[in-house]
């Protein structure tokens, strides 16, 4: 085979790949909106509950699967990057609250209401699948810890707001039509050790350092304008 034929074949192969490569790196600009449902988990925490009706130090809490939902409004810049404002609510059921061998509560929940600004790097291609990764920073509008005692006595509720919470995400988007897409991703949010004051049931009391770092999976739909 001559050098000319090899060179010609290489040029033809490279030329045939250029349109696909160019398309893989571009996407249309525009606004999009998303709505999603969420399954979430958080780890166990040991914290202190102060106040006249507080349990004191060494309180151990465990939580079950959380459920939540949310949505975002975003903008694609046409170069693989997007920015979005997200709102999220989730609640995790309390499964155990103990101090040593003593059961303190039989019911309750740990819930949050958060607004975030996310930056997203999308990897568009000629296929229907578009992987993406992102990071964001949120403001906790409210995080609530509700405790319902195992024995007689009123419930106690604690609330906090204003904490910053970073977020990481990784997922994929699937094009159903030119405007509708299915999305699924995993997200890790870190609010850290929360300090919350009593809202009801323990006047002047507080909880110190129950952690709130949920890991979640989202499934939703997205509409592009």
Tell me what each language-model feature is.
Residues 45-54, 95-102, 143-153, 195-203:
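Outer-membrane beta-barrel translocator domains and adjoining extracellular loop/strand segments
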Residues 92, 96, 168, 174-225:
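Predominantly the C-terminal beta-signal and adjacent terminal strand-loop region
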Residues 48-87:
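N-terminal, post-signal-peptide region of Sec/Tat-exported proteins
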Residues 25-30, 39-41, 72-150, 211-225:
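Gram-negative (and chloroplast) outer-membrane scaffold detector with strong preference
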Residues 1-29:
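Cleavable N-terminal export/targeting peptides
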Residues 36-46, 187, 191-192:
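Short, solvent-exposed beta-strand-terminating loops
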Residues 115-117, 133-139, 162-172, 187:
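Hydrophobic alpha-helical segments of small multi-pass membrane proteins
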